[in-house]
Structures are given as C-alpha cells and as structure tokens.
C-alpha cells in the first residue's frame, strides 16, 4: 500500500490550491507521515484516543473549518493499537468531509479484522464499517496481501467513489493537462 498512499497524498494535495494539508487521525502508520514529509506536503494530526464518540466531530471540525485540509487519513482497524472506529464516528467523518469538501483516505489494510463482529462471510451482513456510506469524497485503500496473509506478495487496491473519480479539478488540468482526479483526459479537455 505504500505507493498507493503516496499517490493519494500527492494527488489530493494538488486538487485545490487552497487545500494543501493532509490531516492524520492518529495512531497511524509512521511511514505515511514520512511519505508526506518527503513529498513536501503540509500535515496536521490529532490522536483519536481523547476524541472518541461525540468528541470527534468538534475536534475534526476545528481543523476542517480552516479550509486548508485536502484529505483526512486514518486506519480502521488500526494497527498496532487495534482501535476500531464506530459507525457513528465514521458517519461524523463522512458528513464533515462532505460539508468541507475534503477527501477521506480510509486505510483498510486490516479490513475484516474488527473481531467485535463476524465479517468473514462475503455478501452477508454485517459489512465492513466505512465512512464511504456517508460521503462521496472517499478513497478506500485496501491491502489484499494483509487481508489474505500473502507472505511476500504485495497487492493493493484504491477504491474510489464514482463521483470523486469523475470530478473536474481545474488545478489538475493546469498542472498535468488532465482534469479528472483518477482518469485519463476527458471530453472536457
């Protein structure tokens, strides 16, 4: 997933010139923050531990209302702390991402490993908790190599909402000659 993270950070921080910061909800993977530093992208962070449940919304909004946050990244479930965000916390993240037009980078490297409920039956409830139920501004980053315990193999997926994938970004058009977030040039070129 390392390269997937790097690309998401880079693209998200270039969509809107006013939004140049990645917000980390910690604990997270140190390599993600290192990638942001290497790329020269501004970042902020807060630790989820003291801001669970109803405290999450005000804390998250205190960053988003500044208008400079391009993306929010968190791991759910989280390793090594194994913190799992609740459905209401994910709703808060999704709704605020929509309100402030911020992209949610949901790290699902350990998808299905929330052992509070049985998630091991494909196409049957309960399903993986995700902020994608509450916003169209999401990229789900999934690691098949971790989920399926592939020793040595690296398989990753970036699942992007259709609305986000097809969104027009003038800053990307100006910089790269493409106007969409994750596709080749469109007829709007």
What residue spans do the PLM features occupy?
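Conserved small/polar residues in nucleotide/adenosyl-binding loops
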Residues: 1-8, 182-189
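Phosphate-binding glycine-rich loop
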Residues: 3-21
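Substrate-binding/gating loop at the entrance of the active-site cleft, primarily
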Residues: 24-41
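Conserved active-site segment immediately N-terminal to the catalytic lysine
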Residues: 106, 119-145
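Active-site phosphate-binding strand-loop segment of PLP-dependent enzymes
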Residues: 50-121
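Conserved core segment of the aminotransferase class I/II
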Residues: 133-184
């Amino acid at each position: 997933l390392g390269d997937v993270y790097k690309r998401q950070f880079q693209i998200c921080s270039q969509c809107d010139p006013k939004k140049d910061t990645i917000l980390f909800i910690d604990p997270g993977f140190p390599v993600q923050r290192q990638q942001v530093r290497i790329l020269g992208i501004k970042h902020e962070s807060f630790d989820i531990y003291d801001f669970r449940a109803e405290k999450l919304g005000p804390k998250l909004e205190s960053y988003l209302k500044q208008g400079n946050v391009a993306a929010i990244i968190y791991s759910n479930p989280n390793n090594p702390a194994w913190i799992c965000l609740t459905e209401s916390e994910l709703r808060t993240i999704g709704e605020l991402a929509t309100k402030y037009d911020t992209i949610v980078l949901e790290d699902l490297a350990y998808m299905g490993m929330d052992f509070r409920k049985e998630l091991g039956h494909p196409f049957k409830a309960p399903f993986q908790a995700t902020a994608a139920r509450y916003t169209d501004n999401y990229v789900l980053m999934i690691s098949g190599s971790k989920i399926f315990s592939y020793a040595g193999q690296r398989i990753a997926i970036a699942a992007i909402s259709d609305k986000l994938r097809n969104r027009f970004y003038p800053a990307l058009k100006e910089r790269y000659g493409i106007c969409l977030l994750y596709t080749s040039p469109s007829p709007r070129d």
